[in-house]
Amino acid sequence: MKMSNMLISTLREVPAEAEIDSHKLMLRAGMIRKMAAGVYNYMPLGLKVLKKVEDIIREEMNAAGAQEFLASAIIPAELWQESGRWDAYGAEMFRLKDRGDRDFCLGPTHEEVFTDIARNEIKSYKQLPLNLYQIQTKYRDERRPRFGVMRSREFVMKDAYSFDKDQGGLDLAYDKMHDAYVKIFNRCGLDAKCVAADSGAIGGSNSAEFMVKSEVGEDDVVFCSECNYAANIEKASSPAEKELKQEFKEINKVETPNTKTIDELVKFFGTNEKKFAKTILFNADGKIVAVMVRGDREINEVKVSNAIGEVINLELASSEDVKKATGAEIGFAGPIGIKVDMLLVDEEVANMYNFIVGANETGYHINNVNYGRDFEGVIGDYRNVTEGEKCPVCGGKVTIARGTEVGHIFKLGTKYSEAMNAKFIDEDGKEKPFIMGCYGIGVTRTMASIIEQHHDENGIVWPLSVAPYHVSVIPVNVKDEEQARIANEIYEKLTSAGIEALLDDRNERAGVKFKDSELMGIPMRITVGKKINDGEIEFKLRDGEMEVIKIEDVYNIIKGEFEKNKIKLK
C-alpha cells in the first residue's frame, strides 16, 4: 500500500477523552474514530489489525476441530425467555420491537441461539461431538463505557459452543479450547494467564479466564508466588484463619453512642479489627440477606450471590429495610435476633471466639459473642482474599494485581440444554440433554490489550504477527528520482514476496514519516536516502537500533525476522 492512497490521519496531540495508552494510541494512529460513547468506527489501519487477530483465532479454532458459522445478531425474545434469562440479563441488553410489536434483542451473547441450532440440527449421538464458533459483533449497553474499545457498547467477539454426549467429552473439548487459547494469545504476542473464575451471567459449573496483567485492568487477580495458582478475586479463596480455642465468656451489651464504623469501634474498645464481626444487609431481588465477615475483611458480592442462588440484582439494603430487620439505624446490625430471609456467616467468623457485634439497637454493641451458642447461619466463604494471605493450594503467600479479561472458557453442562429441551438420542435409544461448553475471546479487547503490553513513548510496537504492515519503506526525498525509484523497487519486491510493505510516498519531511511509522507501530523500517549512491540503505526494527545494510540484502534480512518470529510468509 502507498500512503498517498491511504485514508489515514495521525494525531500529534492526545485526545482529551482518552484515558489509557491503548485508547490514546489507537486514536492518534488513526486506527479508530469515535461515533458515540462506547461506539467506534474502525479505520483501514485498525481494521487490518483486527482482521489479523481474527485470522489467528480462526486458524487455531479450525485446527482444534471447531467449525465456523455465523448466527443472527438480532435474537427473538422467546429464546431468552426459554432459558430464563430475558429478565435476568438486566439493563445491559439492547432490546427492541419490530413493527408487529414482537420483542427482540441485539445479541450480547449467543448461548440460546447455539442451543436452538443444536436441538434442531442434531438428533443422534452419532453427530457428536460438535464445536461451533463464530466471530461476530456483540452489543451491550454498558452503564459506563470507557477505555476506548476495551469496554465498549459494540465489540467483536469470538464465541464457540461445544456439544457432547457425556462429561468426558466436555472435559476433552474444554481442554482443547484451553490449549487453542494458549496458542492464540502466544501468536498474538500477548502475555495472558489462565485463572480460575466465576461463571457470572453465563452460568455453568466450571470456568477459567485468560487475564492480561494491566494497571488499568478492571479485575483484581490473585496469584501465588510459589505455585501456579491464579484466580479472579471473585473466585479466589484462602484458608480461613482459625483462633485458638477459648472458653466462651458471658455476653455483655455495651453502650456505644455515635460509634458505627470499625475504626471508631476499634478506638472505643481499645482492640483490633479482628475482634469484630460486621453484619451487612443486602437486598437480593426483594429478599433481605445479612452477611457476616470479620472486621478487617471485605464482602465478596459474587460469592454472596452464588450462595443465595439465582440473583438478578444484589444491592445494599436501604435504611428502611435495615431498620425493619434490626430495629436500629445502619451501623448497629448484628446476628442475634436479626429478622432476615437468610444469614450468611463467613467461615472465619464461625471460628472466632468472644467477638463483638452490633446489638440491633441504635447506640449499642454486644461483646463476647460466639457462633453456635448465640446465633447460627449458613457458613461459607463470603469474603475477598487480601494480599499476603495463604495460597489454598501450596500455602505460599498470594499477591494481587490488576488484570483485563481477554478470554473465558466455561463448562456449561446441561444448564441451557435442559432449560430449552435440547436433546439427542444416545446409544441406548434414550433422550439425553447435550453437555455443553462455552468459549469466548474478546477480539477488539485483545487488540487493545496487545497495545497495552506493546508500546513506548513514540507509539505502538506491534508484534509482527498482527501488525497492519510488516515494513515501512521511506524515501527521504520523494522528489529525488533515484531515491523514489529504489524505494519503489524495494516496495514492489517485498510485496511480490508476500511481505506487507507500506511505501510512504508522501511529500513530507523525513522526520514526519519516521514519527508516523513509529506511532503506527510498523515492526520494520527501511530508509532510502543519500547512501544509495554507495548501494546502501538504513534498516531499523521498531524497538531496535538503526543499521546500514546493502540494498541487495534487504529481502533476506526481513525474511530472517519472519523466521525468528516463526511466521510463515503467505
Swiss-Prot record:
Record-linked Gene3D superfamilies: Anticodon-binding domain, Bira Bifunctional Protein, Domain 2
Protein name: Proline--tRNA ligase
Function statement: Catalyzes the attachment of proline to tRNA(Pro) in a two-step reaction: proline is first activated by ATP to form Pro-AMP and then transferred to the acceptor end of tRNA(Pro). As ProRS can inadvertently accommodate and process non-cognate amino acids such as alanine and cysteine, to avoid such errors it has two additional distinct editing activities against alanine. One activity is designated as 'pretransfer' editing and involves the tRNA(Pro)-independent hydrolysis of activated Ala-AMP.
Enzyme class: ligase
Pfam families linked to this entry: HGTP_anticodon, tRNA-synt_2b, tRNA_edit
Single GO term (MF): transferase activity
PROSITE patterns reported for this sequence: AA_TRNA_LIGASE_II (PS50862)
Name of the gene encoding the protein in the UniProt record: proS
Domain of life: Bacteria
Complex and partners: Homodimer.
Subcellular location: Cytoplasm
